[in-house]
């Protein structure tokens, strides 16, 4: 449950609650001509995939398959950036609803600093031997909404 995170909760969590309360999701307009509204891109990764990677790394360490050359920081994502629009639309779809998205101005204090594109380079992780696929955005949203948000599971 992400309720305790307030503003720092995931986009899906906020979208789900906006849909429940208002029937729509608000996303930032783009303030750059090379990105359409809602098409700002992030490399969204499902937390279950992160847990799988960490579990695999620990298994490799205990099995003595981990070498010092593999030590270091890893940038984890899926290696495929997706839009905030896709994330919001799939939050509706996971509930059997038609997407209803409104675009609002980005606050001035973040407008000039906002990152329009982030995507993890997965080469380092793949070079360690991790070859499992990651959940698609659609799969991750569907699972999270259906199994955690709709039943309002709290932990």
Predicted regions and their residues:
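Flexible, glycine-rich beta-alpha linker
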Residues: 1-11, 35
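C-terminal substrate-binding subdomain of Rossmann-fold SDR/epimerase-dehydratase oxidoreductases
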Residues: 19-155
């Amino acid at each position: 449950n992400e309720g305790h995170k307030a503003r720092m909760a995931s986009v899906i969590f906020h979208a789900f609650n906006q849909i429940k309360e208002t029937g729509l999701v608000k996303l930032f307009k783009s303030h750059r001509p090379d990105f359409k509204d809602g098409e700002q891109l992030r490399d969204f990764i499902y937390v279950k995939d992160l847990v799988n990677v960490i579990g695999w790394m620990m298994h490799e360490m205990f099995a003595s398959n981990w070498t010092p050359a593999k030590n270091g920081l890893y940038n984890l994502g899926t290696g495929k950036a997706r839009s905030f629009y896709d994330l919001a639309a799939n939050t509706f779809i996971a509930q059997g609803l038609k997407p209803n998205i409104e675009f609002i101005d980005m606050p001035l204090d973040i407008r000039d600093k906002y990152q329009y594109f982030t995507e993890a380079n997965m080469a380092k992780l793949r070079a360690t031997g991790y070859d499992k696929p990651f959940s698609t955005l659609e799969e991750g949203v569907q699972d999270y909404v259906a199994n955690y948000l709709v039943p309002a599971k709290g932990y």
